[in-house]
Each structure stands twice: as C-alpha cells, then as structure tokens.
Amino acid sequence: MALLTTGKPFIRDLEQYGALGVYAPLEGGYEGRYQRRLRATGYNVLHITARGLGDLSAYLTGIHGVRPPHLGKKNIGREAAVGPVYFIPPIATYQLENLPPKSKGLVIWIIESFVLSSEEKQYLINLSQQEPRLKFVLELGGERYFRWQPLSKSLIAA
C-alpha cells in the first residue's frame, strides 16, 4: 500500500455503489484517513455503531422511541414499570435536512457491522439507492490491509 493514498478510488466506488463493506486492519488508523478524505471531498460523516440499533428503518428514517436506563429509580403509578419513553427524530432524515448547502451528502459510517443480518444490509443498500445523497460504509471485519467492496458483493459472499 502506498504511503500516501488519495482515496479517490474509495470515494468513486462509494458514489457509484452507495454502500460499501470495509475491511480494515485491527490496529486502526486507516479508517480515519478515509473519513478525513470524505470530509475534504464535501461529505458529512456520521459515526454510529451497529450494536443496539434495533429496527434500522425506524432508527434512520422514522421517529422512534427509546427508554433511558432507569438507574434503579421507579415512578410508581405514573409511567410504565420499565420507565418513560422519549421520542427521537430519525437520524438520517434529520441529518439530510440540515446538511450545508454545498455538501455532497451524508455518509453514515457504521462500525461493528458484522452483527447486522443480511436483510438489514440489503435495507441499507436499498436506502442508499432511494436517497442518492445518503451513503453507507460498513466495517465488516479485519484485514491485513485496508480494502473495500460493494456491500452487495459482500452479501453474495456471505
């Protein structure tokens, strides 16, 4: 691998396919370089983890309820036994609506994506095709060097 990479093939593939599966060295560092190149190209990057996401469609494109940890406190008779529900705006839709005017789009970088099912990965592929300003990069595992492939090809291999 070259000492200095421009990241142009990575950005070109991301714009072409909309969703990429990434395999990065486990010691880290490489993904930050590619995220910096995405920001320099004009994309906004949002980092989330795949663990605990729940329903992807509700989390990314619909208003969804979450329950904060109760920390041992109970409100007898006022709320449910498991605590109150707070409603949160959709993450991807809200970010897309508030993009700067000169931004190319939003890249959602999802770490620990190996926990996602193939149906959830297929949903992300379809969502990136429906909304052209929305792109996804999923970290699928470790490798000795930084490599990527279209997410649709990684679904076929799985």
From Swiss-Prot:
GO terms for molecular function: oxidoreductase activity, acting on NAD(P)H, quinone or similar compound as acceptor; quinone binding. It is found in: Cellular thylakoid membrane. The keyword NADP applies. The keyword Signal does not apply. Its EC number is 7.1.1.-. It is an enzyme of class 7 (translocase). It catalyses: a plastoquinone + NADH + (n+1) H(+)(in) = a plastoquinol + NAD(+) + n H(+)(out); a plastoquinone + NADPH + (n+1) H(+)(in) = a plastoquinol + NADP(+) + n H(+)(out). Its main location: membrane. It is a peripheral membrane protein. One of its GO terms (cellular component) is plasma membrane-derived thylakoid membrane. Belongs to the complex I NdhN subunit family. NDH-1 shuttles electrons from an unknown electron donor, via FMN and iron-sulfur (Fe-S) centers, to quinones in the respiratory and/or the photosynthetic chain. The immediate electron acceptor for the enzyme in this species is believed to be plastoquinone. Couples the redox reaction to proton translocation, and thus conserves the redox energy in a proton gradient. Cyanobacterial NDH-1 also plays a role in inorganic carbon-concentration. PANTHER family: NAD(P)H-QUINONE OXIDOREDUCTASE SUBUNIT N, CHLOROPLASTIC. NDH-1 can be composed of about 15 different subunits; different subcomplexes with different compositions have been identified which probably have different functions. This is NAD(P)H-quinone oxidoreductase subunit N. It comes from Microcystis aeruginosa (strain NIES-843 / IAM M-2473). The gene is ndhN.
